[in-house]
């Protein structure tokens, strides 16, 4: 599935819900499916600066298909709602090539009106998470050239 197809799927899931109480619950449910990150990876180096809660991200370049290497993201947060946001971002970007990630237009955040329903500090956190995810992809893209 392409990044845009995944975004469209998420938009459809949110469109089925009539209010933001249900949408928050959906985000929290996404977070419950996120596997716990290893204690070794939950360190200062992987901590995302700019988030209100503690958020950790790692990435690896999977070259098992040498013709199409993909980035696999792992993330976690100590806050329930933020963990769901981490899960959403991973769902959209993980499993795609570094170029696809760097070039992606992440419109689903606006379409589901997520930023309108979060505090400014949480919104800054989303920006910081996406910046780090793109930085990982950009680093892998430069390695592959």
Q: Residue spans of the language-model regions?
A:
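Functionally constrained cores in energy, signaling, and assembly domains
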Residues: 7, 75, 93, 104, ...
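N-terminal intrinsically disordered, cationic/polar leader segments
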Residues: 3-54, 61-65, 109-145
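Conserved interaction-surface patches within small, structured recognition/assembly domains
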Residues: 61-80, 90-94
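Glycine-rich phosphate/pyrophosphate-binding loops
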Residues: 95-112
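Primarily the active-site beta-strand->alpha-helix module of PP2C/PPM metal-dependent phosphatases
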Residues: 86
